[in-house]
UniProtKB/Swiss-Prot annotation:
Belongs to the XseA family. GO terms for cellular component: cytoplasm; exodeoxyribonuclease VII complex; nucleoid. Pfam families: Exonuc_VII_L, tRNA_anti_2. GO terms for molecular function: exodeoxyribonuclease VII activity; nucleic acid binding. One of its GO terms (biological process) is DNA catabolic process. It catalyses: Exonucleolytic cleavage in either 5'- to 3'- or 3'- to 5'-direction to yield nucleoside 5'-phosphates. The gene is xseA. Its EC number is 3.1.11.6. This is Exodeoxyribonuclease 7 large subunit. It is found in: Cytoplasm; Cytoplasm, Nucleoid. It comes from Bacillus subtilis (strain 168). Heterooligomer composed of large and small subunits.
């Protein structure tokens, strides 16, 4: 028998690990199971066991993958995990190195719930600033729920017991199943369009997450947000929270709790009325007491004890005030009279008749001055004319003719020399007192 061949544990483990690593079926595989022993390391790594009824597997998801998870893994959660199978050499155990994880079944609903909750919160649908006030004394309550469930009976019973005056209108709707969300939305919109109530209670009794899912639908949440009527959400039990609870104006733990929120209790109203009556009575008594003291004070005052003296004093004050008034009135009338005279004089000066009169006066003055200036000018011109005339007369031929001389003309031309005429020419001789027509018989020139 030959010597046996031995391998070390490490070598065998490495060999087995290589077998896992090169197997294409184990490199990228989806595994369905339940989470247990979940431990989240401070660095972000997640260590957990993935199991089913018959087996379990050690698993790990490193931080670079776990930080992308949209939910927090918890024990008992059904999940689908994608990853690769390999061997962890120090322990020799095979384990799953997870790359992706998502809830399975109900877990998927939970994931969708969280995603919608985050989306609507980001849009502000949960903000308190949009919450409407519930009326203190509503006349009509609308209830959107199943007409045959226990919830509607609990709501009606509680409303009538607490506040018999209220009117209850049931708006029947499907509260689970495929068409439930659309049915709930239709009833909410109908109540708003017809304005049939002061408050709406929207809800149902408890159930599984699948049964309550209609109240986690986005269309229901947006219908509640858009409602002009205040809405109380009452879905399931106290531990159940739906998207509708966050959007509604107020959330009640149960349908019965919603009814208690919607209306006051008659007994409480009676007690509040009695308390208010006592406070009003005390306030009236205190007010009347104060007025009584005031009247007593007035009755003991000087005016009530000596009314005639008060009258005489007031009469004296009146006389003094009247005299002051008369003096002020007289002074005022004097000022107004003087002002009126000044205004009258000014207006008369501006009157057309007065202005015409003044214009005539100015015209007459200017005319007289013009005539005076013209006379002076005429006298000056006449004197100058006489002077010039005297000079002209001294030079005028007529003055020469006055001394016995005459002027000879030939054909209207003055003859200055005998050379201008011939014998037989007809001449006109102008004397001082007439004209002679003559014929030249002979011309003789002067000897030089």
């Amino acid at each position: 028998m030959g010597e046996a061949a031995y391998v070390t544990v490490s070598a065998l483990t490495k060999y087995i690990k290589r077998k896992f690593d090169v197997d294409p079926h184990l490199e990228n595989i989806w595994i369905k199971g339940e989470l247990s022993n979940v431990k989240i390391h401070t660095r972000g790594h997640i260590y957990f066991t993935l199991k089913d009824e018959n087996a379990r597997m050690q698993s790990v998801m490193f931080a670079r993958q776990s930080e992308r998870l949209p939910f927090k893994p918890e024990n008992g959660m059904k999940v689908l995990v994608r990853g690769g199978i390999s061997v962890y050499e120090p322990s020799g155990n095979y384990q799953l190195y997870a790359k992706e994880m998502q809830p399975d079944g109900v877990g998927a609903l939970y994931l969708a719930y969280e995603e919608l909750k985050k989306k609507l919160a980001g849009e502000g649908l949960f903000d308190d600033r949009y919450k409407k006030q519930i009326p203190a004394f509503p006349a009509t309550i609308g209830v959107v729920t199943s007409p045959t469930g226990a919830a509607v009976r609990d709501v009606i019973t509680t409303l009538k017991r607490r506040y018999p005056l209220v009117k209850v209108i049931v708006l029947p709707a499907l509260v689970q199943g495929e068409n439930a969300s659309r049915s709930i939305v239709t009833r909410i919109e109908e109540a708003n369009e017809k304005e049939i109530c002061d408050v709406l209670i929207v809800g149902r009794g408890g159930g599984s997450i699948e049964e309550l899912w209609a109240f986690n639908e986005e269309i229901v949440a947006r219908a509640i947000f858009a409602s002009n009527i205040p809405i109380i959400s009452a879905v399931g039990h106290e531990t159940d929270f739906t998207i509708s609870d966050f959007v509604a104006d107020i959330r009640a733990a149960t349908p019965t709790g919603a009814a208690e929120i919607a209306v006051p209790h008659t007994t409480d109203l009676i007690e509040r009325t009695k308390t208010a009556e006592v406070r009003m009575t005390r306030a009236m008594q205190q007010h009347l007491g104060q007025k009584k003291e005031r009247i007593q004070t007035l009755q003991s005052s000087y005016a009530f004890r000596f009314p005639k003296r008060l009258y005489a004093q007031k009469e004296q004050q009146f006389d003094l005030a009247y005299q002051q008034f008369q003096a002020q009135l007289t002074a005022l009338l004097d000022r107004k009279s003087r002002q009126l005279e000044r205004e009258t004089y000014r207006l008369e000066a501006l009157h057309p008749h007065e202005q015409l009169k003044q214009a005539r006066t100015r015209y007459q003055e200017q005319t007289n001055q013009l005539r005076k200036n013209m006379n002076i000018q005429m006298k000056q011109l006449h004197s100058q004319f006489q002077t010039v005339l005297g000079k002209l007369n001294a030079l005028s031929p007529l003055q020469v003719m006055e001394r016995g001389y005459s002027l000879a003309y030939k054909e209207d031309k003055l003859i200055k020399s005998v050379s201008q005429i011939e014998e037989q020419d007809r001449l006109e001789i102008k004397l001082k007192d007439g004209v002679l027509t003559c014929e030249v018989l002979e011309k003789r020139g002067e000897e030089k």
